Amino acid sequence: MNEFENLLSRDLEFAQNKSNRIMICLCIDCSASMLLQGAMKKVNDGMEAFLEKTNNDTLARDAADICIVSFGDTAQLVSDFGTADEALHNLHAHPILPVGANTVLAAGVNMTLELLAVHQKQLEAVNNNAYIPWLIIIS
């Protein structure tokens, strides 16, 4: 899906789903330290369980806008704001794997905050009230 189609899809979703949104930003450490004691696998399993439970709950599914950012040597967008189902699909398509020796936590948090500010403006533009966003950092 190209950027234009993605925007149209989001506009359609905003028009059809009038639920107040809760923006949930998962900021995930994928530095080499996450190899210790299988930490990365536990994080991926936990995110998958969270996304599946969110997707299976009607109220949560309609309200949750989920974004996933990973950070190791660099910060990377894994899944832009969307449904739990979209985030799960993106997580399966681009699994978070431990890479690099550095942990650029600030870069990951800054990217997440920038994405959050943009998405908050998108919601305001369609008069959608949003709850206070969650920023969850796993390191």
Model-identified regions with their sequence ranges:
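Short, mixed-charge, low-aromatic patches
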Residues: 1-9, 62-72, 107-111
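Short, flexible, mixed-charge acidic loops at enzyme active sites
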Residues: 79-89
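Von Willebrand factor
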Residues: 17-81, 92-132
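DG-centered beta-turn motif at the end of beta-strands
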Residues: 26-31, 43, 68, 112, ...
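Acidic, polar low-complexity linker/tail segments
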Residues: 1-25, 30-41, 118-128
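A short small-residue
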Residues: 25-31, 89-96
